């Protein structure tokens, strides 16, 4: 999960320059309209592929081996560049935090679609630990339980 199409393109360019073998595995979802085509390509590929997009946090079903890991590069904060979102956040900061928590949990849920499914979620944004500490009550217990070991390890390493 990239934060934007621009950041996804930067990541793709970096992979092409520094990890060409891994770059070949990436399916870049260039727009929300291209999402279905990219998902079909991913599901049909006989080789392991990696989807890269900011538009796969919701409305996507990738059970079992279709998604064993995911990387969230940026916390899914609502866009404060949108006037309505900025006004709503100014009126009710808790709403903004709740929307972020919902989007984060939704993204996390991409990798576990049923009781026997499993996957690993890596959240790279340094704001993640601060968000979990500050808004802990907004997150479901199972999510907090999954996040705690990673947060403790990061804290021990001084991250």
Regions found by a protein language model. Give the residues of each.
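A short acidic (Asp/Glu
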Residues: 8-14, 60-65, 132-135
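Conserved RecA-like P-loop NTPase helicase motor core
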Residues: 30-131
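Charged/polar, solvent-exposed surface patches and flexible loops
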Residues: 10-13, 17, 37-44, 106, ...
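Conserved helicase motor "Helicase C" RecA-like lobe of SF1/SF2 P-loop NTPases
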Residues: 2-32
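A generic structural motif
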Residues: 23-38, 145-159
């Amino acid at each position: 999960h990239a934060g934007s199409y621009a950041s996804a393109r930067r990541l793709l360019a970096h992979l092409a320059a520094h990890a060409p073998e891994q770059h070949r595995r990436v399916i870049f979802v260039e727009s929300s309209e291209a999402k279905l085509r990219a998902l079909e390509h991913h599901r049909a590929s006989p080789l392991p592929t990696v989807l890269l997009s900011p538009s796969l946090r919701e409305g996507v079903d990738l059970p079992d081996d279709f998604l064993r890991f995911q990387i969230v590069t940026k916390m899914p904060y609502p866009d404060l560049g949108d006037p309505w979102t900025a006004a709503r956040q100014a009126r009710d900061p808790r709403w903004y935090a709740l929307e972020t928590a919902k989007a984060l949990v939704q993204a996390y849920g991409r990798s576990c679609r049923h009781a026997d499914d499993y996957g690993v979620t890596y959240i790279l944004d340094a704001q993640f630990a601060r968000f979990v500490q500050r808004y802990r009550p907004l997150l479901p217990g199972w999510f907090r339980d999954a996040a705690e070991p990673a947060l403790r390890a990061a804290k021990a390493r001084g991250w």
